[in-house]
Curated annotation (Swiss-Prot):
One of its GO terms (cellular component) is plasma membrane. This is CDP-diacylglycerol pyrophosphatase. It is found in: Cell inner membrane. It comes from Escherichia coli O7:K1 (strain IAI39 / ExPEC). The keyword Transmembrane applies. The lineage of its organism: Bacteria, Pseudomonadati, Pseudomonadota, Gammaproteobacteria, Enterobacterales. The gene is cdh.
Amino acid sequence: MKKAGLLFLVMIVIAVVAAGIGYWKLTGEESDTLRKIVLEECLPNQQQNQNPSPCAEVKPNAGYVVLKDLNGPLQYLLMPTYRINGTESPLLTDPSTPNFFWLAWQGRDFMSKKYGQPVPDRAVSLAINSRTGRTQNHFHIHISCIRPDVREQLDNNLANISSRWLPLPGGLRGHEYLARRVTESELVQRSPFMMLAEEVPEAREHMGSYGLAMVRQSDNSFVLLATQRNLLTLNRASAEEIQDHQCEILR
């Protein structure tokens, strides 16, 4: 019993330290790097010179930019042209806010252009990390390759994923995930952030504790994946963990 109590105490200490490290990362100047690139470089250059650089694309009227990430050969980031910190923002459950996940899915074309040939949809994944699972304080969706082991696990669970948010059998990467199947027409009409907030009990009040990902399945449907922060299990809700920025799946 004493050993069990000690182990529990150690886990709590580790969780508190992890939370503290996450907070420290988000309070430094470097946490504003992406926001400065968008607002001080990409957007002004597009508006003044019709040149999106250093971004790959700037769409002021649509409210987003696409930027090549330095990590990995094919990873891109989709970001808003205005201030949104992350998943905790109430703007993401406002119907007037752009459907950033759908826009990010269109942004996968940049991966193919960079690769020099079409990147199969089955190799692509989108992910956004929770408030404690990110290092930047500007909303950004990672557009990158999926890990081969995650791809295989989702393929094997195709029949078990329904149109309701349900626990994914076995979770992913050692963490619990909710999974929901959506059609392309559903995705076009409704943001995954709204689906999560409106369909998962108490999610709306705790959106910042969730990481969210999206993957296409072999039947052309999409799977939404949501993981919630749980520091006792060392889960910071970094949905980016399902991605492989080195793109082994293409080799």
